[in-house]
């Protein structure tokens, strides 16, 4: 339990009908007594005047007192709900800060105290910020699932399985004279594979949750006049890019943030790729390649009136060779309205081929559906959860150590190495929920929160 008491405005700054001030810490009850002039009954709303030190009324509203541990932070908490004018809120906060032992809260400190007092784990605390920042209904639902503990429960299930497996492995190491060899009888190998499979499923859901939170970066690339800017306009639903018949019209990177059925996409239009003599166009082309290297997916635009080829290696082998293998690619044969080709997805092999007309919009819906599939969109976010980059990194490291442990078990029956890899895996999973976290990590996470949360 902390010894200091903190105060902050819990509602957004600015003018509003209602403004809420939150106080948390051992002095909360004293603050209530000094500001309202009476001892508040726990968990009852009382309509009272809020008084200055000399007894003059600063505002009037509802006061609520929650004694520990039955509060958001796990500490004594006071909430004053008054009028939402910035001057009124400022006067009340100054009044409370004048009481000995009370200080202004840091960003995210209320949520941090809730975490430190075991009222929630780290993923739930992060979900509060994600719920506030949600840019779509689907993102809000996913953040709420995390806040309610769904992500935490999946991680806890994995940790419990790891602990159970570690018992078997440690027993095989410590009692080699036993008749049953736990490492050789297939029990450990089977349980290990089950954990790997479950972790892969969690990683897949977490990837979709991260895309829901951060969005997928899609870069439109190709030669000049392939219709890249027209496709950007078609996807965004507005004239974001200038479209002309002059090659090299787009010389810089253009960005649009859109949602497809609640899934956020960062669509980036780039300069046409070619050997340019113009210095400004050269800079734009280099920037295009920089964006391509950082993309989650590349839409390779092809002018269908210039070639019948559909294989990108045949269309432009140098482009394919330069594209990083980790980046997914979709071939877009544009101007299908002029070539008479059937619109839509033609095959779903790697890479997927889509025929469309960026100018008329025909076939663009097929591309939208394809992009949703690339993001792992299932059409049902009720069971999903929100995830962050640090969660994905921790899950990736956990998977790597499980893989090492499996290789050591299968190749060498190396129980000691397997035991160590399982321990490290468990540590990485515990980082996600905060059971094992450095103070620096906690500071970075909570400092990104709103003040008053």
Curated annotation (Swiss-Prot):
Gene responsible for this protein: mnmE
Domain TrmE-type G: 215-376
Database matches in Pfam families: MMR_HSR1, MnmE_helical, TrmE_N
Family annotation (PANTHER family): TRNA MODIFICATION GTPASE GTPBP3 (PTHR42714), TRNA MODIFICATION GTPASE GTPBP3, MITOCHONDRIAL (PTHR42714:SF2)
Function summary: Exhibits a very high intrinsic GTPase hydrolysis rate. Involved in the addition of a carboxymethylaminomethyl (cmnm) group at the wobble position (U34) of certain tRNAs, forming tRNA-cmnm(5)s(2)U34.
EC number: 3.6.-.-
Keywords (A to Z) from UniProt: Cytoplasm, GTP-binding, Hydrolase, Magnesium, Metal-binding, Nucleotide-binding, Potassium, tRNA processing
Domain of life: Bacteria
Cellular localization per UniProt: Cytoplasm
One GO BP annotation of this record: tRNA wobble uridine modification
Name the record gives this protein: tRNA modification GTPase MnmE
Annotated SUPFAM superfamilies: P-loop containing nucleoside triphosphate hydrolases, TrmE connector domain
């Amino acid at each position: 339990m902390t010894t200091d008491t903190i105060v902050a405005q819990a509602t957004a700054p600015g003018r509003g009908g209602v403004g809420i001030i939150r106080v948390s810490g051992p002095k909360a009850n004293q603050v209530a007594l000094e500001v309202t002039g009476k001892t508040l009954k726990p968990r009852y709303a009382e309509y009272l005047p809020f008084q200055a030190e000399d007894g003059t009324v600063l505002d009037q509203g509802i006061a609520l007192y929650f004694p520990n541990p039955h509060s958001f932070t796990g500490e004594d908490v006071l909430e004053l709900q008054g009028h939402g004018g910035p001057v009124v809120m400022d006067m009340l906060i100054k009044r409370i800060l004048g009481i000995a032992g009370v200080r202004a809260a840091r960003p995210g400190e209320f949520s941090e105290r809730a975490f430190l007092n075991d009222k929630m784990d780290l993923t739930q605390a992060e979900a509060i910020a994600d719920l506030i920042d949600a840019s779509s209904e689907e993102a809000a639902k996913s953040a709420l699932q995390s806040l309610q503990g769904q992500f935490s429960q999946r991680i806890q299930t994995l940790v419990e399985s790891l602990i159970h497996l570690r018992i078997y492995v440690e027993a095989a190491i410590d009692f080699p004279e036993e008749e049953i060899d736990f490492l050789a009888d297939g029990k450990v190998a089977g349980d290990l594979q089950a954990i790997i499979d479950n972790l892969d499923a969690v990683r897949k859901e977490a990837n979709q949750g991260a895309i829901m939170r951060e969005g997928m970066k899609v870069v439109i690339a190709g030669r000049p006049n392939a219709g890249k800017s027209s496709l950007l306009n078609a996807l965004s639903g507005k004239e974001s890019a200038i479209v002309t018949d002059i090659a090299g019209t787009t010389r810089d990177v253009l960005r649009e943030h859109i949602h497809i059925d609640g899934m956020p996409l960062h669509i980036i239009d780039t300069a046409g790729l070619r050997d340019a003599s113009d210095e400004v166009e050269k800079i734009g082309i280099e920037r295009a390649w920089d964006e391509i290297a950082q993309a989650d997916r590349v839409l390779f635009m092809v002018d269908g009136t210039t070639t019948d080829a559909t294989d990108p290696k045949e269309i432009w082998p140098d482009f394919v060779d330069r594209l990083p293998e980790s980046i997914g690619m979709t071939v877009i044969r544009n101007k299908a309205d002029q070539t008479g080709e059937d619109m839509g997805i033609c095959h779903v092999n790697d890479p997927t081929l889509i025929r469309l007309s960026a100018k008329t919009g025909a076939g663009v819906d097929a591309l939208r559906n394809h992009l949703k599939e690339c993001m792992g969109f299932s059409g049902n976010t009720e069971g999903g959860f929100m995830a962050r980059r640090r969660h994905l990194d921790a899950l990736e490291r956990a998977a790597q150590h499980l893989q090492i442990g499996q290789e050591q078990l299968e190749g060498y029956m190396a129980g000691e190495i397997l035991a160590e890899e399982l321990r490290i895996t468990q540590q990485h999973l515990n980082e996600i929920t905060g059971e094992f976290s450095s103070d620096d990590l906690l500071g970075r996470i909570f400092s990104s929160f709103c003040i008053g949360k």
